[in-house]
Amino acid sequence: MFCFWRTSALAVLLIWGVFVAGSSCTDKNQTTQNNSSSPLTQVNTTVSVQIGTKALLCCFSIPLTKAVLITWIIKLRGLPSCTIAYKVDTKTNETSCLGRNITWASTPDHSPELQISAVTLQHEGTYTCETVTPEGNFEKNYDLQVLVPPEVTYFPEKNRSAVCEAMAGKPAAQISWSPDGDCVTTSESHSNGTVTVRSTCHWEQNNVSDVSCIVSHLTGNQSLSIELSRGGNQSLRPYIPYIIPSIIILIIIGCICLLKISGFRKCKLPKLEATSAIEEDEMQPYASYTEKSNPLYDTVTKVEAFPVSQGEVNGTDCLTLSAIGI
């Protein structure tokens, strides 16, 4: 009779847990194990949470008035296990999980849910909530997997080829192309569990100018369009944003230099003309003085002042020269 009552009470608690569970937590890939020879009821759940988001893990939804002890057993990969426990009768809270960013979602006397405010790769592991009641123990296991969206890059290469890369994703991303080409895909695993996938494709058809790289991942899908190169000049396209500004700057500098040179010439020519005029003016007084003081200038003046005929010159050359005083 006692066993029948205990089994009936256990069934009521199970029905209550199933009815209330959907109101607070959403569990995926859930499997339930129930051994009829033991009052222990166990539920195994796999949960995938994106990195940087909040995770909320729930125990069996059993009224706290029926619970005696609620214990979270946390086993993170690469770290020793720790526990967070709450005794209902004494309302005492005990924890050995300090510094791991794992706490009660609220006060345990209100709700025994566990909260991770910002999920990181270090939070991967198993989380077990064990609820002890007079009717039996209820255990809920979570296998927490952290999702990391990949960083996607893509670029064209020579000879009508293109590269698409999904870096550091968890799990590994899937890369496909449209239209299909001759593709080679490689992957590289990292120490933190992330994977980098790189796909290189080549298209022989000349009528294919644009292709699409499709990256599929649990955190979301991406479709990227790439224009294939048509010749060697396409390899310069990534450098065009740097080449054009450099050419413009060189043109501006050249114009400034030409303006400075032309302005210097205009300023220099008037100075040269003014200098020549000053030198000529300075020479004129000296020439006047020389002309006045030199007897040779007087003689020439006299000869020019008294011209003679041709016959007189022929007959009286010596007399004339003597008379003049030469």
From Swiss-Prot:
Glycans are attached at N29, N34, N35, N44, N93, N101, N159, N192, N207, N221, N233. InterPro entries: CD200R, CD80_C2-set, Ig-like_dom, Ig-like_dom_sf, Ig-like_fold, Ig_sub, Ig_V-set. Residues 1-25 form the signal peptide. The keyword Membrane applies. It is found in: Cell membrane. One of its GO terms (biological process) is regulation of neuroinflammatory response. The chain crosses the membrane at residues 239-259. Its main location: membrane. Residues 26-238 are extracellular. It is a single-pass type I membrane protein. Residues 138-229 form the Ig-like C2-type domain. One of its GO terms (molecular function) is signaling receptor activity. GO terms for cellular component: external side of plasma membrane; receptor complex. Gene3D superfamilies: Immunoglobulins. Disulfide bonds join C58-C129, C82-C97, C164-C213, C183-C201. Residues 51-136 form the Ig-like V-type domain. Inhibitory receptor for the CD200/OX2 cell surface glycoprotein. Limits inflammation by inhibiting the expression of pro-inflammatory molecules including TNF-alpha, interferons, and inducible nitric oxide synthase (iNOS) in response to selected stimuli. Belongs to the CD200R family. CD200 and CD200R1 interact via their respective N-terminal Ig-like domains. This is Cell surface glycoprotein CD200 receptor 1. It comes from Mus musculus (Mouse).
